[in-house]
Amino acid sequence: MERTRRDAGLSTANPRSFYGARPDTSISIRLLNVVRRGLRRTNSSVLGAISRRLYIRATQRRGKHLGEQQRVLLSLLQPHDPLKREKSLPAIDLVVPFVEKDLRSLELVLQQALRNVRNPISRIVLITPQNSENTGPRFIREESHQILADIISSRSNIVLRHDQDVLGPEILAELENRFGRGDRNAGWVTQQLIKLSAALASEAPASLILDADTLLLSKKTWLNSSGRQLLQLANEYHTDFMKHTLKHFGVPKELKMSFVTHHQLMQTDVVRRMFPEGGASLVAWWQSSTDAIGRDLGDYEVYGAFLAHHYPTRVAHGSFANLFSPHLTTFLADRERTGWSPERLIPGYCSVSFHSWAQVDRADRGD
């Protein structure tokens, strides 16, 4: 592999060194990479369960969550595909909210999801803001309309919906009351509400919600026929999300790990139990926020915590193994030049996220 990468003109170091946000030079990071490669071959649910019990005991003794390196290790100790042996898998929806800047890689995002999701995909639901004339997507560049049209025409099961249609009247009224029209502060809470609203409205047993800046790199089974699902453990830790989840739903957190993983399966019956009155329940969840613009609301965190607390037998914990990359331009250029798949360019990871706000290229940030 090293010789092949060199022949292709690519770095022979770990992908974290040349696509990641931080240099891969420390001994601890190098050890984690060795562990990562070994654990992917084991896919052991037993090892994952033992490590979670040890982590819970450690946090109970300490009285708080552990540090980032310990959380990363715990996530890596989980199986990457704990439901791999399952057969007769139920079909699910794939839901991808996006904006114009995401069109550059949206086709690749869909390709990677279809390649690596083992469950059949019944529908691909693309969700984007509508323009002020209510005539189509809110795009600035004329060529963006053709790019989207080509994506939609390439697959028969794609459905295009607009934010306003997904959110519904109760949420739209609350947005108008709080922010008026065009307030950028509405962006964060709108994202949370769109994903949960889409999951609520799904006719499938579950929806895989996928951020439009995230590529899936590893085959995974998301849901089995008895309703048991993959729930990945993240490296991040968001205290505000957890405090609000405890406040609104009364859900404590024994396993002090995050579920903010940039993509997550949401089962329809679980989301409907969380928000039994649909849009009105979502508004109540928002109104219980202690932050003026809802920055303590976390869609992935609240669903994961609720599921783990109320339906523990329906949870199969898995490894996140995500690479956070500020180098979308470099990645796309390398892929174009070599013809390699994303999995080959970024081996050893389950997904990679190119968050626009972190990109080193201003054009990729949407500036």
Task: Give residue ranges: language-model regions.
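Membrane-proximal basic amphipathic "stem/tether" segments
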Residues: E2-P90, V352-H355, V360-D367
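A conserved hydrophobic helix/loop-capping motif in glycosyltransferases and polysaccharide synthases
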Residues: D93-K101
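Short, acidic, metal-binding catalytic loop of nucleotide-sugar glycosyltransferases
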Residues: Q112-I121
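Short beta-strand/loop segment that forms part of the nucleotide-sugar
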Residues: I121-N131, R161-Q164
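Active-site-proximal specificity loops/subdomain of glycosyltransferases
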Residues: S144-S197
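Short aromatic/hydrophobic "clamp" motif used to bind/position activated sugar donors
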Residues: S207
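Conserved donor-nucleotide/metal-binding helix-loop-beta segment in metal-dependent transferases, i.e.
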Residues: L217-L246
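Catalytic core and acceptor-binding pocket of nucleotide-sugar-dependent glycosyltransferases
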Residues: M257-W340
